[in-house]
């Protein structure tokens, strides 16, 4: 069994079996494979109940007793994923890694994701054992094989990692931290082109403790996390490798929790990844992975495996997971710390928001107006020209085109567009032609008119707009519909939900920084209303009003501090707790506010993903977000999308829409990631 560091607690899910007898196990396995068919239940029960060290003793005993190779017999008796999983457990960890890498670089094509996962996450000692195991098993040099199968900066970084020479000293020099921050900044953000060698040297050699401080200092100095700079400066497999290295430096268990989630979400399961991680981490940090998994995804690793796999394969994986966890929302101390750090990162980051649509250079409203008129005149419509012009002009420029169109032709451009294009494309193009506040006002009006109310649209708009945007929406609503937005919300919604929306619609959110004493008081109110405080005080109605006031009027920096204090006070995360304790539209509104405070681009990335997930597309939500965020933060949304869902927004749109609507959406998306 893998030994934890001195003084550290063992965090694996597989332990040495008490009263272990290798001869008895060898006999039981032989019996399980004898005759017609095999007793798979007995095989998985023995192998998942023994540590890797004990399994090696069973292999020896099996050979001594029967003159046969246990792994060869298991391969013969078992099939498919179950066989790969059991055989993986029977190999010593370094030989298991060696086999994975050999498979990744054999044959046509290379499994870069496998190479990245193994080489970015292993310790120096594990790396040395891997190199030796590869040499022993295949009589080949691992470094030479990797060089022969990869290229460029990706290859260089893999070779650096393969050396297993990362510094391991916990004593950190503040001067060297500052120097590395400066060197990374100058190698990327400040340089025309990127000095990849600096990234490779620093990220490939410095100690984990040192690099964590470098990342913290980099964020304070530049206002952006190191990951954002890597995405902006590097590309391809090299970018993916460097991001994996950074994730493993920050938290190796969190890296594997993400990999496991991505292996099981969506259609189909990436079984090779699932097997590799469950085998390799079972005696290292599976308990930490489980906690972080539950924290991030609000479901236990156990339940996701249970729903995503079947048969003996499922039973074996569940045994390796070590058990199920409590209901989502409650934390172990380690997981609470991870959530706290997420809020800390959110609080410190000065993220530069970037849209994908920018003002066109050499803008000529006269030429654009004429081109649009020509595209709509006569028989048929030239949709390509309409899409090309309107998606490549800023909203201010589009308003100038509208004015010029009217001056030249005495016609209303919006009316002409309505008569020439239809369906989803019309909604998108006409939305782009409206000033943002008038577009939002129209979306709110549509959400409230007719039978039923689109509460999700009301929440999405009112929970995410700035004070200035909200004030502009109020003016536009009054101008366009001769009624105040507040009156419209009052007549179309009710109860606590109505009060939340009206509070948000006033646009009176504070805009200052945090107040620590006030934040602790606010966190206490949140704990009491969510019924997890030790000492409730005050009546429920009064608490509900105070909680609403906190979420709807406190500044974003202050709320981030409130949510951190909430974790310290309760060992719970506020978002998970709201989801668990509340229901209906009130819950959805509060969750949207919390998510927007934490990471607004990620909030919109989630909404976009859900609009295209499963059968059918929610074109209204897709259009609304693509139009309203195109000049604000759509580039940031794109980055969050690919980070969370392992595919680009461009790919998702391409797979879910078609025709001219697809063309216009891709133009707004602004490129592939």
Curated annotation (Swiss-Prot):
Give the misc comment. Answer: Seems to bind one calcium ion with high affinity.
Q: Which residues carry this modification: Phosphoserine?
A: 13, 422, 537
Q: Which residues carry this modification: Phosphotyrosine?
A: 30, 201
Record remark: domains: A pair of annexin repeats may form one binding site for calcium and phospholipid.
Species whose genome carries this gene? Homo sapiens (Human)
Which compartments does it reside in? Cytoplasm; Melanosome
- N6-acetyllysine sites (modified residues): 63, 68, 75, 81, 306, 370, 418, 483, 620
Q: What induces it?
A: By Epstein-Barr virus (EBV).
Keyword set for this entry? Acetylation, Annexin, Calcium, Calcium/phospholipid-binding, Cytoplasm, Phosphoprotein, Repeat
Example GO molecular function: calcium-dependent protein binding
InterPro entries per UniProt: Annexin, Annexin_repeat, Annexin_repeat_CS, Annexin_sf, ANX6
- Record's comment on post-translational modification: Phosphorylated in response to growth factor stimulation.
Q: Which residues carry this modification: N-acetylalanine?
A: 2
Q: Which family does it belong to?
A: Belongs to the annexin family.
Where mainly located? cytoplasm
**Name of the featured protein:** Annexin A6
Which function does this protein serve?
May associate with CD21. May regulate the release of Ca(2+) from intracellular stores.
Q: What are the ranges of the Annexin repeats?
A: 20-91, 92-163, 175-247, 251-322, 363-434, 435-506, 521-595, 599-670
Example GO biological process: apoptotic signaling pathway
- GO cellular component terms, semicolon-separated: collagen-containing extracellular matrix; cytoplasm; extracellular exosome; focal adhesion; late endosome membrane; lysosomal membrane; melanosome; membrane
Q: Does the keyword Phosphoprotein apply?
A: yes
């Amino acid at each position: 069994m893998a030994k934890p560091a001195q003084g550290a607690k063992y965090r694996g899910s597989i332990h040495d079996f008490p009263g272990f007898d290798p001869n008895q196990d060898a006999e039981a396995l032989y019996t399980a494979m004898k005759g017609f068919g095999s007793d798979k239940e007995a095989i998985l029960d023995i192998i998942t109940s023994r540590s890797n060290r004990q399994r090696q003793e069973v292999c020896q005993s099996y050979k001594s007793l029967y003159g046969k190779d246990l792994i060869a017999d298991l391969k013969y008796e078992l099939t498919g994923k179950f066989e790969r999983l059991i055989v993986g457990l029977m190999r010593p960890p370094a030989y298991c890694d060696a086999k994975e890498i050999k498979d990744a670089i054999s044959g046509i094509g290379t499994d870069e994701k496998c190479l990245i996962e193994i080489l970015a996450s292993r310790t120096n000692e594990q790396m040395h054992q891997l190199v030796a195991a590869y040499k022993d098993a295949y009589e080949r040099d691992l470094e030479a094989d990797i060089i022969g199968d990869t290229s460029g900066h990706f290859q260089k970084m893999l070779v650096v990692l393969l050396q297993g020479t990362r510094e391991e000293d916990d004593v950190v020099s503040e001067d060297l931290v500052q120097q590395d921050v400066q060197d990374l900044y100058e190698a990327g953000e400040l340089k025309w082109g990127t000095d990849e060698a600096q990234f490779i040297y620093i990220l490939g050699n410095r100690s984990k403790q040192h690099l964590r401080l470098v990342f913290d200092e980099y964020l304070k100095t530049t206002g952006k996390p190191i990951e954002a700079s890597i995405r902006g400066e590097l590309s391809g497999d090299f970018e993916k490798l460097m991001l994996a290295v950074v994730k493993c430096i920050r938290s190796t268990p969190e890296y594997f929790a993400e990999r496991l989630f991505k292996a099981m979400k969506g259609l189909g399961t990436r079984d090779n990844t699932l097997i590799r991680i469950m085998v390799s981490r079972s005696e290292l940090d599976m308990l930490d992975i489980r906690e972080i998994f539950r924290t991030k995804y609000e479901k236990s690793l156990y339940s996701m495996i249970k729903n995503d796999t079947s048969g003996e394969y499922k039973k074996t994986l569940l045994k390796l997971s070590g058990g199920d966890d409590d209901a989502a929302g409650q934390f172990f101390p380690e997981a609470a710390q991870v959530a706290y750090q997420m809020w800390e990162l959110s609080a410190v980051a000065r993220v530069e928001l970037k849209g994908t649509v920018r003002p066109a250079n050499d803008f000529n409203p006269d030429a654009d107006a004429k081109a649009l008129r020509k595209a709509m005149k006569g028989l048929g419509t030239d949709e390509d020209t309409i899409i090309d012009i309107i998606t490549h002009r800023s909203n201010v420029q589009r308003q100038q085109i509208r004015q010029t169109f009217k001056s030249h032709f005495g016609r209303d451009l919006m009316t002409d567009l309505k008569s020439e294009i239809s369906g989803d494309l019309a909604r998108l193009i006409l939305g782009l032609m409206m000033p943002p506040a008038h577009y939002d006002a129209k979306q709110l009006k549509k959400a409230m008119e007719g039978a039923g109310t689109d509460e999700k649209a009301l929440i999405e708009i009112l929970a995410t707009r700035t004070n200035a945007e909200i004030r502009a929406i109020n003016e536009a609503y009054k101008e366009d519909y001769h009624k105040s937005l507040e009156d419209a919300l009052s007549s179309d919604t009710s109860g606590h939900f109505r009060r939340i929306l009206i509070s948000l619609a006033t646009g009176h959110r504070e805009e200052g920084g945090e107040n620590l004493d006030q934040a602790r008081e606010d966190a206490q109110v949140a704990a009491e209303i969510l019924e997890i405080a030790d000492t409730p005080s005050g009546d429920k109605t009064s608490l509900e009003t105070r909680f609403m006031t906190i979420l709807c009027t406190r500044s974003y920096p202050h709320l981030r501090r409130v949510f951190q204090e909430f974790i310290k006070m309760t060992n719970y995360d506020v978002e998970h707790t709201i989801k668990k304790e509340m229901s209906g539209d009130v819950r959805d509104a509060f969750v949207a506010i919390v998510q927007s405070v934490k990471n607004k681009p990620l909030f919109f990335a989630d909404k976009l993903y859900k609009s295209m997930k499963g059968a059918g597309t929610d074109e209204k939500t897709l259009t609304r977000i693509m139009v309203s965020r195109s000049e604000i933060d759509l580039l940031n949304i794109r980055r969050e999308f690919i980070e969370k869902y392992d595919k680009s927004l461009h790919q998702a749109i391409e797979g879910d829409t078609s025709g001219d609507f697809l063309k216009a959406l891709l133009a707004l998306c602004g490129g592939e990631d």
